[in-house]
């Protein structure tokens, strides 16, 4: 029986589709040319400064970068737990569809579409990688597909974990309109703050952030209205316990590996950072230099003001397991001909992404014996 307190709407999904289309337009039209994306990123970029992206190290942005995705992950795992517990606890049966919406939006939105299908394969260079912002790659608009794996800017995975909370707008919209609007506003604020944190680090463009909102919104919309059919289930409580799939005992076997996979995906995306600074005075004479650097761009500069010193500055950053580290060292060794500075910068552990920039200033005439790089 239809609940008389809920107004009848033959196309209840249409208003939500309209604002999602508006979101897509805002994420698209202003960014059809590079101007706005580059202008917004230039607010955080300071060429010539000791750190080109100094706001990356502001404690507030750093906190959001490191811990921002965790509330979404814990929410999705809790929903998965409710799905499994409902198999043996009748009191939870009425929440099956709601829990499925919360979990599936995470699995399909930030999980499948954002971080797997697009981010790993679209190939858009990050802001700090493009020539206009101090890098070496050509700027690429969000709608231009690049070389898979060469750039992981589009869309922003971190901010998609903030925008994921749009699921609570859908769950509240029919009976708690004010709460739904508050959930939508809070979601927009949280996801955008995480996105700005990534922009401040030179890791994502504004268009990456806005498009990361589109994916969880449209997926939650489709699941809510057409797959899980939650409005119909709420109007017919006797059918609201869920479909046969949601009642299946297979969930007991599927849930643990799903939970482990989601947790592993988040852990494998743990940020790692290393600030590189070595001011090395040569024991005697004009030194030589041996370089062994992985996944970093190297710039060599002859500096007449450095007669007996080698100055190494830069930074490296990436994503990997929590125990993965970026190790670097600079040590003098004596050969038959001269003193040699051995500079190394290598990852320890496994990384899903690693990038960095190193500038080496040295006296004119310094012999570079070896340069090993992996890009």
Q: How would you name each of these model-derived features?
A:
Residues 96-112, 244-272:
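Internal/C-terminal transmembrane anchor helices
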């Amino acid at each position: 029986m239809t609940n008389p307190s809920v107004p009848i709407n033959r196309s209840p999904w249409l208003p939500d589709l309209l604002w999602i289309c508006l979101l897509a337009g805002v994420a698209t039209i202003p960014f059809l040319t590079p101007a706005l994306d580059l202008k917004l990123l230039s607010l955080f970029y300071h060429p010539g400064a000791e750190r080109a992206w100094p706001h990356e190290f502001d404690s507030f942005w750093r906190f959001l970068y490191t811990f921002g995705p965790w509330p979404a992950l814990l929410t999705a795992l809790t929903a998965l737990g409710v799905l499994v517990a409902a198999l043996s606890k009748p009191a939870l049966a009425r929440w099956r569809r709601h829990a499925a919406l919360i979990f599936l939006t995470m699995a399909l939105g930030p999980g499948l579409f954002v971080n797997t299908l697009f981010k790993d394969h679209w190939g858009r260079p990050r802001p700090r990688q493009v020539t206009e912002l101090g890098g070496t790659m050509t700027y690429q608009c969000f709608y231009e597909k690049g070389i898979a794996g060469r750039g992981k800017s589009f869309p922003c995975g971190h901010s998609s974990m903030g925008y994921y909370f749009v699921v609570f707008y859908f769950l509240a919209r029919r009976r708690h309109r004010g709460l739904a609007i508050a959930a939508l506003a809070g979601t927009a604020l949280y996801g955008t703050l995480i996105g700005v944190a990534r922009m401040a680090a030179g890791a994502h463009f504004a268009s990456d952030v806005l498009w990361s909102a589109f994916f969880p919104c449209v997926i939650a919309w489709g699941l809510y209205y057409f797959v899980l059919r939650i409005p119909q289930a709420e109007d017919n409580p006797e059918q609201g316990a869920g479909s046969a799939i949601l009642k299946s005992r297979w969930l007991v076997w599927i849930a643990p590996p799903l939970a482990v996979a989601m947790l592993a995906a988040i852990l494998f995306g743990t940020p790692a950072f290393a600030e590189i600074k070595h001011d090395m005075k040569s024991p005697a004479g004009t030194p030589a230099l041996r370089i062994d650097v992985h996944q970093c761009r190297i710039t060599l500069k002859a500096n007449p003001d450095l007669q007996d010193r080698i100055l190494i500055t830069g930074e490296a950053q990436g994503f990997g397991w929590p125990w993965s580290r970026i190790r670097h060292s600079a040590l003098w060794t004596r050969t038959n001909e001269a003193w040699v500075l051995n500079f190394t910068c290598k990852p320890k552990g496994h990384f899903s992404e690693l990038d960095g920039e190193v500038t080496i200033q040295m006296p004119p005439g310094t012999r570079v014996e070896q340069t090993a790089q992996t890009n």
